[in-house]
Amino acid sequence: FAVAGALFEHAFVCIARRGHPGARAGMTIGQFLAARHAVVRQKGRSQEIADRTIDEMGLVRNIGLQSPHFTSLPFLIADSDLISIVPRALGNAFAGFAGLQMMPPPVALPPIPLAQHWAAASEADPATLWLVRLIGELFLGRDPTLRAETDDAE
């Protein structure tokens, strides 16, 4: 495969139900580690970046629930004291329809790079090049909530 380069980077955010005891003024590391976490565990998911970083820091989370899919998280979190770390775009979507609160994680997590890939054999194909350029242009005008900043995550 050839890589066209990074399109953008997602930041991670924490999500919790509105009124979650640790989410009112932002979560401390102690509250974060003590809280029960809902985690998505599936190979190749962006969650591996957050999980690996937290593990490398020597931090141990209280895993209350594991799921192979993000789609169940908002429903599980909305009616519980579970928290989760998700890419910002998912946090925005979940906050909008499930009434969840977003906040910056209390630990520094690297951004999630998103790049487009295509078969090297297609590099000379005009249709492929057109599509690659179109996708790149669309991401230049992307939704600003996909940016890596976390200062407005609350």
Feature roles, as predicted:
Residues 17-18, 106, 119-121:
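Residue-level recognition of the GNAT/N-acetyltransferase active site
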Residues 16, 22-29, 35-57, 124-133, ...:
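Secondary-structure junction motif
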Residues 41-101:
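Hydrophobic hinge/microswitch elements
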Residues 1-12, 16, 26, 52-53, ...:
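Short beta-strand-centered segments that line the small-molecule binding cleft or hinge
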Residues 10, 107-118:
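Periplasmic-binding protein-like
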Residues 5, 30, 74-75:
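Alpha-helical segments flanking ligand/cofactor-binding loops in enzyme cores
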